[in-house]
Amino acid sequence: MRSPDPDPAHPRPRWIVFGDSFVMADNEPYERTFPARLQALTDDRVEVLSAGVTGYGPDQTWMRMQQLLPKWKPEAAILVICAVNDFGDPVRNNLMRLDADGVLHRQQATPGPQDREWFLQRQEESGRSGLARLWLAWHQWRALEVPKHPDQTLLADYMRAEREDYEAHISGSTVANALLRDIYDADVAIHPEWPSSQYKLRLAEAILAGIRDLCAEQGVPLAVVVVPGAPDADPDYWLRPDPGRYPGWQPERLTSEWQGICERVGVPVLNLYGTLKDAGHRVFVGALDPHWNGAGMDLGARTALPFLESQGWSLGR
């Protein structure tokens, strides 16, 4: 975990925050991340652990919770949903699938050749000196140029790729693809009537129901915090869909669908769409990055704490 090691004495209430890079947030110093800000806002009366893993979807997070909940025995668990790609991640990961009767099944999956090559390259680069890696990263970032206008062509490419991912998934593929890429759930946001979109919603609901049941078995209260991404909540983001070209797009749809899923499975949910949308670009990283920044995580923590208190979660003494 990115947070400090759990206190073995466990003298305070312990909350664990699960999710992906919206939780791990290695683009910010740890003290500016959502879990760290949440703990600071309790005046350190609550120990808040950060169990987020960059690139994880809700399916992988469920498996991580199976390991960490019995080990660290928290008083509560928070699942942060990244409403950029968390619908699509389980389809690309191919670790879980629904059969024709809607029953969820697990299976083994292996990374595709591009992902394996990426990991091997990063493993090789990790042996270089810090200065050499910094120099390489600087040159890579210099080569990136933010488009002057939203890239609507890329959105069409995303939707085509999402249809292909869906077709491979339902045909039984066991190859995991795009493990660390932020692929916007454009099909759900723009075309909720598509089979790929409808399947993603059903799969997400089955996964969240499994997470709910796991937490109930462990005696751990669960709450979900849904965080929008820059394509939907930052008016200046480069990948923001054009309503003229995509009249079916609703910027609040991804977060609203997650909220509806939580309500149907009976999990308390906080939807941060309105909060972050009103704050605009100042709470997002900007450029080519869809993540919230330190200001966004602070605002999210300040909004989440009263919500969690309203669920009866103890803040200790």
What are these model-predicted stretches?
Residues 58, 62, 201, 205, ...:
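Short, amphipathic alpha-helical "lid/cap" segments that border enzyme active or binding sites
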Residues 82-260, 272-282:
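Serine-dependent acyl-ester chemistry module
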